[in-house]
Each structure stands twice: as C-alpha cells, then as structure tokens.
Design a protein with these regions (language model features):
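C-terminal transmembrane helix and the adjacent membrane-cytosol boundary/short C-terminal tail
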Residues: 213-221, 228, 297-355
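Transmembrane alpha-helices
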Residues: 144, 148, 208-215, 219, ...
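Transmembrane-helix boundary motif in ABC transporter permease subunits
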Residues: 111-142, 329-338
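Glycine-rich helix-loop "coupling/hinge" segments at transmembrane-helix boundaries
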Residues: 261-305
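Transmembrane alpha-helical segments of polytopic membrane transport and secretion proteins
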Residues: 1-50, 329-355
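Periplasmic/extracellular loop-to-transmembrane helix junction in inner-membrane transport proteins
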Residues: 28-45, 64-111, 131, 186, ...
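Membrane-interfacial helix termini and adjacent extracytoplasmic/periplasmic loops
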Residues: 74-98, 153-202, 273, 283-286
C-alpha cells in the first residue's frame, strides 16, 4: 500500500472516530444540563456559597479602602489629631507604614528561614523514612499543632522561649556582635525579634509540613524505584527523584506559611518589645521593628478616629500583601505542581473531543 493511501485511510478513520465521539459528547452534555429539582437546588446553593465568598472578600476590601482613605490623603504635618499616640512624629501615611511593613516582612522572613528546613525534614521523615504506623501518628500531631490558639503560643513564648534564648543571645552578641544582625545591647528579658520569630516559626510549621508531605507522597513510585534500581541511596533518590518533582509544591508551601506569618498578631504582640522604626537587630529590646498586625492590636483601643483610619490603612496594606502571597502560592502549585501535567492533558483531550 502506498504512503498516500495510508495517510488517506488514517485521515478517514480519524474523522470517523471524531464523528462517532461527538454525539456521545453531545448526549453527555444534554444529560448534564437535564437536572432534577433537587440537583438544581443543590447547584444553586453551592453557586451561591461560592459567590458569597467573593462578595465577602470584596466587601472587606471596599471597607478597608473607604476607611483608610482619610488617613492616606490627610496632611499629617498640620493635622493635630495625628500628632499624638501611635501616629506621633510621622510626616505622612507612607512614612508611618513603611517601618511597620519592614518589621512584618523581617520577622516573617526569619520565621520562614527557621521553619522551612525543619518542616521539610519532618515531611521527609513522615513520607519516606518512618514506619507506616508512626507516620500516621506524627501526621496527626502536626495537624493538631495547627489548631493551637495564637495566644497559647504567645504565652509559651513568654514562659519558655524567652528565658531559653536569653543565654543564646548573650553568646551571639559576645562572639558575633560585629555583625549588624547581632549588634546592640542584648535584651535582659528576652523580648527580642529572635524570640518572636522562633515562636512564629513553630506556628507556621504545620502548614509547610502538611503541604510538603502531601507533595512528597505524590511523587511517582516509578521515579523512586528507577533511582533505587540505578544504585542510588535513599537520600540520593530523594534528591534526584523527589525534590525535582516536588520543588514547586515546596515553594507554594513556604509561601502559604509566609502568608500565615504575615498576619500573626497575638504571639508577636505578647513577646516582642517593639518600636515603629527600621531595625535589623534581632537580640535587642525596645528597638525592635513592629509588625502591622501587632501594632493594630496594641493601639486600636486607644486611637482616635483619624488614628484608627491610619491603622486600618496599614491593615489594607497587609491585606494586599497577604492576598498577593497566597495567590502566588496557589498559582505556582496549580501551574507547575503535581498533577498539573495530567490536568493539561485532560483539558487538551476535552478540547479535541468538543472540536
């Protein structure tokens, strides 16, 4: 048979298969559109619930914008109401919010640096090293850790972490005080950025651990067995087969943990002795950068009307930053994480059938 006949036969068979598939697709779509009354009620309920979430989110954003505008556009140097309390000595709204944003990002970054290697280590142990029964127990404990209230973590930080880290702070300042990070007079009470970051790291540990564990478990078994069959050790198999597959998932887990850290309030407010300044020191007391959430919690009850608008404005900035971080994490996990390729294949097949 000639090449032209083969191509013609293949084209006819492809056309026939598409023609035979189209009626089935149309029947399936017609069947899906013919819903019973109960299904229609349930569909309306679920659709309304999804729309309600969007309405609530939009309502929160509109509220924050409307309440923050008076403080954002106010003339701070000439407004007497802004020359007292939490807004004293600031020439504009942006001069007020900039050190708060720095403090929020600084504390969260240190917490992420502490929590990420520990969380990934726990996730690897649960998914690849521990016995099945122990893995179940450890997984449950990690999930339960996420349910502990923030104020409990704050009290634990005051009673346990601050006294525990005080000698470490003296040691770091004595031997590494020439580094700006450890410079300054060490705190005598332990109310430092380091203590707050350690507590915050423990609080975000369950998020990073749980997501990383699930991503590690989704690594194709054939990839792992192929690496082991080539003579790789357990660690080499993880490094060559698991980590490349789970890289985007780990990044998303870290970003979601960062989103939690950015909005944490009570633990930071209880532990750190802050000021609204730019500071990178982690061992000092009284000259620590304040976070947005803790500043709102501490000053909102005593603030005047316009000062509250300024605090709400800082909350608007935190809302935007946290929302952006979470969207980025979801996008990375959905676009390049485990299952993304299969989802793209399903969408391509569906498009081909409907063509």
């Amino acid at each position: 048979m000639s090449d032209s006949k083969i191509v013609d036969t293949a084209a006819r068979s492809s056309t026939a298969s598409r023609d035979s598939a189209r009626p089935e697709g149309r029947r399936a779509r017609r069947g899906a559109s013919t819903l019973s009354p109960g299904d229609k009620v349930f569909l309306g309920f679920t659709t309304g619930s999804a729309l309600l979430i969007m309405v609530i989110l939009a309502g929160v954003a509109i509220f924050l914008i409307v309440k923050a505008l008076p403080a954002i556009v106010a003339d701070w140097p000439t407004n007497s109401e802004l020359h007292a309390g939490p807004t004293l000595a600031f020439g504009s709204f942006w001069a007020y919010v900039a050190p708060l944003l720095w403090g929020t990002l600084w504390v969260s970054a240190i917490a992420i640096l502490i929590a990420t290697p520990v969380a990934i280590g726990i996730a690897l142990f649960i998914s690849h090293y521990s016995p099945r029964r122990l893995a179940g127990v450890l997984g449950s404990l990690v999930d339960l850790l996420a349910a502990v209230p923030s104020v409990v973590f704050g009290l634990w930080g005051i009673i346990v972490i601050r006294p525990f880290l005080r000698p470490l702070g003296d040691f770091l300042n004595h031997y590494l005080g020439w580094i700006p990070l450890f410079a300054g007079q060490p705190s005598t009470t332990g109310s430092t950025i380091l203590a707050g970051s350690v507590v915050l790291a423990v609080m975000i540990l369950p998020i990073i651990t749980s997501i990383s564990r699930e991503v590690f478990l989704q690594t194709p078994r054939l990839n792992e067995e192929a690496a082991l069959a080539l003579g790789a050790t357990q660690w080499e198999m993880i490094r060559l087969a698991v980590f490349p597959y789970a890289r985007s998932g780990m990044v998303s887990a870290v970003l979601l943990g960062l989103g939690r850290a950015l909005g944490e309030t009570m633990a930071i407010a209880l532990i750190i002795s802050p000021s609204i300044i730019f500071s990178s020191r982690i061992l000092t007391e009284g000259s620590n950068s304040q976070t947005i959430a803790a500043n709102i919690a501490l000053n909102f009850p005593i603030a005047t009307s316009l000062q509250r608008d300024a605090l709400i404005g800082t909350g608007l900035l935190l809302f935007v930053v946290s929302f952006g971080v979470n969207i980025l994490a979801r996008y990375i996990l959905g676009a390049t994480g485990p299952g993304a390729a299969s989802r793209r294949t399903r969408r391509a097949n569906k498009a081909a059938l409907s063509a």
